[in-house]
């Protein structure tokens, strides 16, 4: 079966579209990437999305217009990724997250979380003529979960190893990890874990945009940060903050790691008189150190391999810093195992859609998200 996975992550770089051929179900799941491309948002739309993510108030009418514009962009990406390739029979669209609030565990009750993704599936189905599964996070939230991360079950069946302990580390705007125990052990699936590790590229990207007055949006290959020296005192101070100490299940987003958060970090840095490259090196160090600290705090087994994916997988300096913190683990990318590091998340939502519509298989892992039970994920929309 041919399926398209669509996602725009917290970096808001554009829409990742993956056309895949898929067969099997879980242990026999097989994926072939036929075509994968990233389609940038129109600059004006991207700017509006970033403003919303940053908490800028807008009217309901404006929100509806942006929802429409995102859905149209996603539909266009789905149409274009098929050019010259077999026609897809199914779309799995994550949409664009603009707000994410994890559940609050009170003394007497649990306040359910909330996660809003724009780009409604009904319009995508109508514009493409292809059945579309979307709104994947709602069912997990209704069951008391974090609704994030949602890809660990897909990671488990695509990237686990018979004898190795692995971590699949996505570094998008936010970092998230899937811990995969050896899959030859009895009940190994129950030992799969996952959570958000903290900032991925989001603070680095915001700093780059500020330093270049918007002329650059990211640190290409980490070259700018590599010229500097990280301030370890600052990194230690930041890692004492509440999120980094919180026990999984946990999730986060631009609501926490926001321009205001970066501004506070900048104020913290003033006594150290950092150069621009030192500043970027320090923010990069926070990403690497938060990932490593998260492993050391919450994973008891020694990690044989770390499989990096997402935009951060192209940042050589960041991977070097991660290797410095975790010298006993081999740092690879998912490309090394045949799964595109650029499109792994898009592939995952294609798989989740396939599990939902074709197989009737649950997509979340309760031990990862904190949900009361495994759930069928996603709303199904058929074309008119």
UniProtKB/Swiss-Prot annotation:
Residue sites binding ATP per the record: 9-16
Pfam families: AnmK (PF03702)
Record carries keyword Nucleotide-binding: yes
Annotated protein name in UniProt: Anhydro-N-acetylmuramic acid kinase
Pathway terms, separated by semicolons: Amino-sugar metabolism; 1,6-anhydro-N-acetylmuramate degradation; Cell wall biogenesis; peptidoglycan recycling
Domain of life: Bacteria
A GO BP annotation: amino sugar metabolic process
Function as written in the Swiss-Prot or TrEMBL entry: Catalyzes the specific phosphorylation of 1,6-anhydro-N-acetylmuramic acid (anhMurNAc) with the simultaneous cleavage of the 1,6-anhydro ring, generating MurNAc-6-P. Is required for the utilization of anhMurNAc either imported from the medium or derived from its own cell wall murein, and thus plays a role in cell wall recycling.
Reactions mediated catalytically: 1,6-anhydro-N-acetyl-beta-muramate + ATP + H2O = N-acetyl-D-muramate 6-phosphate + ADP + H(+)
């Amino acid at each position: 079966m041919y399926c398209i996975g669509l996602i725009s992550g917290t970096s808001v770089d554009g829409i990742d579209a993956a056309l895949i051929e898929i067969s099997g179900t879980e242990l026999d799941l097989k994926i072939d990437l036929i075509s994968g491309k990233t389609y940038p948002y129109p600059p004006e739309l991207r700017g509006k999305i970033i403003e919303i993510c940053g908490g800028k108030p807008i009217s309901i009418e404006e929100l509806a217009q942006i929802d429409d514009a995102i859905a149209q962009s996603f539909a266009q990406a789905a149409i274009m990724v098929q050019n010259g390739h077999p026609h897809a029979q199914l779309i799995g669209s994550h949409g664009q997250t603009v707000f994410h609030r994890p559940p609050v565990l009170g003394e007497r009750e649990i306040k359910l979380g909330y996660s809003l993704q724009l780009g409604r599936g009904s319009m995508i189905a109508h514009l493409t003529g292809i059945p579309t599964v979307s709104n994947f996070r709602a069912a997990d939230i209704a069951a008391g979960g974090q609704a994030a991360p949602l890809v660990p079950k897909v990671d488990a069946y695509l990237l686990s190893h018979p004898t190795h302990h692995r971590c699949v580390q996505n570094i998008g705007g936010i970092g998230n990890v899937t811990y995969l125990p050896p899959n030859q052990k009895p009940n190994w699936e129950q030992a799969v874990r996952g959570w958000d590790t903290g900032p991925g590229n989001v603070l680095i990207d915001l700093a780059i945009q500020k330093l270049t007055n918007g002329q650059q949006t990211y640190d290409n290959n980490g070259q700018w940060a590599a010229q500097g020296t990280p301030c370890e005192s600052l990194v230690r101070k930041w890692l004492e903050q509440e999120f980094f100490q919180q026990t999984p299940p946990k999730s986060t987003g631009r609501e926490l790691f926001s321009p205001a958060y970066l501004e506070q970090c900048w104020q913290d840095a003033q006594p150290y008189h950092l150069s621009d490259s030192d500043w970027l090196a320090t923010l990069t160090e926070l990403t690497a150190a938060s990932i490593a600290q998260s492993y050391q705090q919450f994973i008891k087994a020694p990690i044989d391999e770390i499989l990096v994916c997402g935009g951060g997988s192209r940042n050589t300096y960041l991977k070097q810093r991660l290797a410095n913190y975790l010298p006993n683990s081999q740092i690879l990318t998912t490309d090394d195992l045949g799964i595109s590091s650029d499109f792994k998340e898009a592939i995952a939502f294609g798989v989740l859609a396939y599990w939902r519509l074709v197989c009737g298989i649950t997509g979340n892992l309760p031990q990862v998200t904190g949900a009361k039970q495994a759930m069928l994920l996603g709303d199904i929309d058929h074309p008119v």
